[in-house]
Amino acid sequence: HASYRRQRQMCIRDSPNTDYAYFMKGLAAFSKEKELLSSLPVLGDMTHKRDLSSAKVSFNELTEFITRFPESSYVEEAKSRMLFLRNLIAKQEIEIAEFYIKRKSYIAAVSRADYIISNLPNSPFVKEALEIKVEAYDLMEKKELKIQAEEILNKFIRASKE
């Protein structure tokens, strides 16, 4: 079995179309996400009501593809799709965090905001995530944490203007 696995890995690695196979693997999950999106009349605030696990799978598969095949001719297309997926996932996390704020589940809201800040740092929703943290800490009456979150938010805003 071990020699079979080694040979299989060598064949996969040496195949001239391996990059395409990995790219298509990422697109398969992306296609599922596009189908879900096209079935909704207007995306609007509906993101939080949908399961975006296929978007996350696609994002991870495309990340692996780019890591393994940085010189592939499909990299730019993969990056474009990842940008769309990243923003879709971040938007959902913001909507869920806002839902938690309304439900007074402040720790859960902070957790969702932290996910965006840590895992999707280049998304356009980072500022909103930081604002949610400030609001949640304020509502929990956690003065020190609120001050820290405000400082980070202010640094982020200043850095964004540069």
Where are the regions a protein language model picked out?
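Single conserved hydrophobic/aromatic residue that forms the stacking wall/gate
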Residues: H1-I12
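Short solvent-exposed coil/turn linkers within tandem alpha-helical repeat scaffolds
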Residues: R13-Y20, K34-L36, K49-L52, F65-S80, ...
